[in-house]
Amino acid sequence: MSEMSVVEYEVVSKNLTSKMSHELLFSVKKRWFVKPFRHDRQLGKLHYKLLPGNYIKFGLYVLKNQDYARFEIAWVHVDKDGKIEERTVYSIETYWHIFIDIENDLNCPYVLAKFIEMRPEFHKTAWVEESNYSIAEDDIQMVESIKRYLERKIASD
């Protein structure tokens, strides 16, 4: 029986004067955001140790001075040999002032609101909240509900 390998994976997490990059991993198995094992404030990175499995990477990239925001969802697969495959499945661009208000919208999917809420503070990295519960919907339903919500939200504004 082969031993499962743990893989190190890093994402960007920084909030500077004019731009912000915010990425977090979501565990498909545990149905909640993965807690990073290390925060690197100097480089603006979060470091994860991942077991083989499937993850969803949420990404938010902002140019504050230009009122621009891009949100992405990517599937991340770690195989038993430690090889990582990543594929972007959704991307949308909008105004930053619209996106920042989403976390206060009662119609916003819970996971999206939590992702926005956990964005990094000024000159810090994001802090992932631990949770004693997981979301009820499966990964595909969750991604589809986020996509539908954002398409409606951005079309209406």
Curated annotation (Swiss-Prot):
Classification via Pfam families: DUF3258
Residues in coiled coil: none
InterPro entries, per database record: DUF3258
Protein name according to UniProt: Uncharacterized protein ORF157
Organism: Acidianus filamentous virus 1 (isolate United States/Yellowstone) (AFV-1)
